[in-house]
Amino acid sequence: MMWKNIAGLSKAAAAARTHGSRRCFSTAIPGPCIVHKRGADILHDPWFNKDTGFPLTERDRLGIRGLLPPRVMTCVQQCDRFIESFRSLENNTKGEPENVVALAKWRMLNRLHDRNETLYYRVLIDNIKDFAPIIYTPTVGLVCQNYSGLYRRPRGMYFSAKDKGEMMSMIYNWPAPQVDMIVITDGSRILGLGDLGVQGIGIPIGKLDMYVAAAGINPQRVLPIMLDVGTNNEKLLQNDLYLGVRQPRLEGEEYLEIIDEFMEAAFTRWPKAVVQFEDFQAKWAFGTLERYRKKFCMFNDDVQGTAGVALAGLLGTVRAQGRPISDFVNQKIVVVGAGSAGLGVTKMAVQAVARMAGISESEATKNFYLIDKDGLVTTERTKLDPGAVLFAKNPAEIREGASIVEVVKKVRPHVLLGLSGVGGIFNEEVLKAMRESDSCKPAIFAMSNPTLNAECTAADAFKHAGGNIVFASGSPFENVELENGKVGHVNQANNMYLFPGIGLGTLLSGARIVTDGMLQAASECLASYMTDEEVQKGILYPSINNIRHITAEVGAAVLRAAVTDDIAEGHGDVGPKDLSHMSKEDTVNYITRNMWFPVYSPLVHEK
């Protein structure tokens, strides 16, 4: 079983990293690209514009000689030039409010994105640790809050309640003939910020930036989608700058009819595409997942991606205690937050326990405690969310509605995991109570995004819960210097470690649907990535600098699971039989060979 092989796989992963045996991209000279634009038009097309990177002969062919400064720069030189300007911006904004600086950085990157996509993604890949927090969490939350004011040019597609009956034709307005990856939101629950309506489009854009940078999906084959069915955010409805439909959200069948129509339209035009649902409110996150997962190739990142990343971290905490992975069945876990992410994490963890112990999922819930805004969920609760019913405890064990600190003191859990979206809810009293945990190395996961919504900071966790804890968060925090001179390692338990690999592996396997087996394979692969030595130090997740290698490994694991589940139909010239005959190393090599890398293609004009 996978669980028994994690230590061995960790050593193999470490060896691969140490000896550099695999490269996650190709820098071979690409073939020519046919374009139908010339002159200034080509300079205004971010897919093909090279700025000062056009060779002189190409400038002649495309009629742009004299429209650019005479010096020809390589992509590397252009990257260096951009980074120099970016560092200058950092120096010039020192002392400014954090939000002001974050938005200034985002604007600078966004202007490059709008002008030259190849250079944008080269800069992003080469500086992923610095720039991921700007184009993705946590800055993307700030961008969404201000998107109507920040909007300058369109990116992605918008399908609204006013477009009912027109989507099958609208989908052909997208200029790219092929789309591989779609990320869609309805804006109803953007990170921990609530209903942001049409302004939630920033989330699909940021997610797809990570698909390109981490998974090597060709940027000309990605599509951000905003389904605007209205908003219940009165502040937005009263804002004259708001760019969305100014009406309350559609509900019930009216809502589902809009999403049904979009899904039919998208898969009619691009039947091989993979669709990722993102930041839907809990009832629709679960509802649409169950509605579409067996019909279309789709998954929900909040429910399944977050769960996979959390499960990988939870398995790591067992290893950090010096215990075998099989001891996960004995871990007591308190989950704070019963939304789509919280329930998704709890469900996947329970499934893992059931699988390990050979028991039913109902029996496997014994050591899981779910807390929502009304306290501990028990069988006394009325109007309980259907997804939470399985985890309701007997009130004879702990009273209905018990607070977090009550539950922690009573249960003495090995893990306290937060997906509540409530900043600071793990206060000093709660964190100090974790000192009495039954674990020799208690784990605290503050996974809510953005940073202001994190259940606690890393500094507070190590200060109040003790220096021997394992800490993970959804947004980035700096490592903490402890009083004994050691370092309290901060792990970013972010979905970026999984969703790019899930999407890439699904795409290259040609899977008809995304199965639980594929998702579990992704999680187990991530769990096995770190060495025992790293885990003993409290390091559960790898450096984001290795994101392309991580994604290749996860993608290969997903592909192999698709083959095992007999749903892989192949991709391009690689058929299902070819996939089934691939070794583990073959699948990783196959994945890496198909990862796009930003280099300038020679452009050839045709009328």
Swiss-Prot record:
Chemical reaction(s) catalysed: (S)-malate + NAD(+) = pyruvate + CO2 + NADH
Active site: Y136, K207
Details of cofactor binding: Divalent metal cations. Prefers magnesium or manganese.
Keyword Lipid biosynthesis: no
GO biological process, one term: malate metabolic process
Cofactor: Mg(2+); Mn(2+)
Annotated site (Important for activity): D302
Positions with a binding annotation for NAD(+): R189, D302, N449
Transit peptide: 1-32
Pfam families reported for this sequence: malic, Malic_M
GO molecular function: ATP binding; cobalt ion binding; malate dehydrogenase (decarboxylating) (NAD+) activity; NAD binding; protein homodimerization activity; zinc ion binding
InterPro entries (UniProt xref): Aminoacid_DH-like_N_sf, Malic_enzyme_CS, Malic_N_dom, Malic_N_dom_sf, Malic_NAD-bd, Malic_OxRdtase, NAD(P)-bd_dom_sf
Function: Involved in the regulation of sugars and amino acids metabolisms during the night period.
Subunit structure and binding partners: Homodimer. Heterodimer of two related subunits in NAD-MEH complex. Interacts with NAD-ME1.
Family: Belongs to the malic enzymes family.
Protein name per UniProt: NAD-dependent malic enzyme 2, mitochondrial
Organism of origin: Arabidopsis thaliana
Annotated gene: NAD-ME2
